[in-house]
Amino acid sequence: MAVTASSEAMGASSSRASLNALDGVNFFLAALQSGFGPFVAVLLADEKWSQQSIGFVLSVGGFAGLLSQLPGGELLDAIRSKRFLIASGAIMVAVGALAIALWPTRPLVLAALVLQGLTGGLLGPAIAAVSLGLVGHSALAARLGRNQRFASAGALTAAAVMGVIGYFLSYRAIFLASSALLLPLLAALSRIRASEIHFGRACGQPDHHAPTPPPRIPRVTLWKNYGLLVFAGSLFLFQFANAALLPLAGEQLAYRSGTGASLLVSALIVVPQIVVIFLAPWSGRMAETWGRRPLLLLGFSAFAVRALLFSLTGDPRLLLFVQLLDGITGSTLGVLTALVVADLTRGTGRFNLAQGLVGTLAGIGASLSTAFFSLVAGNFGATAGFVSIACAALVLVLIVWLWMPETMPAGQRAQDHTAPG
């Protein structure tokens, strides 16, 4: 289905108030979600849970997130009120955090992590859908870069503040503070004008202007979309290689640095977030100037070099510099994941379902990663583990180089090339 210029021009109608409010939603949502993850493991360990029990509940939460991807995408394509879905998901996360803080019993913690996991197929894709609905396809790259900047800033700020809260107050207080972030998040969300979120655009059907659900291609057609399958496979391989890299590095740092390992691992996580804050808007601009494929190759190549350097040095000071490359990868993928899916599903009405498909395959890759590369490292040594990750990363670069098509619309590319200055 052709996309008319008038359809995309409507993106300019979104008010500055709505776009600024979306900045706040990205910031506070990332901050709210940062209360989970490593802080859950720390709290449960402090509550004298066994390592097996902690691993079990975290795995169940991750599995729930994996199962939620496709239904979440289907829901986002079908329901007009994306703000309602974001609010519902955020409330689920906040209720889960509150339950963990007040009653960290096994049934409640398990239920809280399942609740939080179920939002995984909803919140991130919903932010992308709202962004597309507000600004249209032609301005989406820049908007996604801005989203990534504010999300990284929110996660970084929350991690620092919650670390201080945990140190001076208690680990339970971290989750009380996390749940309190629901209030500013809902306040920011309420400032996004629902009338400015174009329903058709938010589903990848920009010519549909009615308040009813837009026409959609059959679901099975997504499995025949060559570019989408190559991209989803690339993200599967990326997550398969990437998810094990920091845990494997953390194990080696623990052997070498003892009690200082947690601080070193925290630094390895923080450094890329700082890079993303500064680099994400640039990635959005370059996605329009260079095209999607060169930027994707840059991000994956940075990952391959990073994995190789991890195999060559265990010096924590050098690893901090190596982690700058993770910021490059994070900033490019933070923009390109939703952008490439939007390119490939333009005019289909299945943008969000396609996001769910890509998210499912990426999640499967991440879930297999740690077990596989830990097995390699356990049998052949840590260096072999890092080298095998680097080899997988090189295969990833080759796949994108040989088979991934450029997805930026030809008309948009021509417009960029003829623009003055």
Label for each model-derived stretch:
Residues 2-16, 196-231, 420-421:
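Juxtamembrane intracellular "pre-TM" segments in multi-pass secondary transporters
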Residues 12-62, 230, 239-253:
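Helix-loop boundary and gating motifs at the non-cytosolic
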Residues 68-81, 279-291:
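Helix-to-loop junctions at the C-terminal end of transmembrane segments
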Residues 84-98, 179, 294-309:
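Structural signature of the two symmetry-related core transmembrane helices
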Residues 114-151, 340:
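Cytoplasmic helix-loop-helix junction between adjacent transmembrane helices
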Residues 167-180, 375-392:
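A membrane-interface helix-boundary motif in multi-pass transporters
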Residues 179-203, 396-404:
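C-terminal membrane-cytosol helix-exit motif in multi-pass small-molecule transporters
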Residues 350-379:
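A late C-terminal transmembrane helix in Major Facilitator Superfamily
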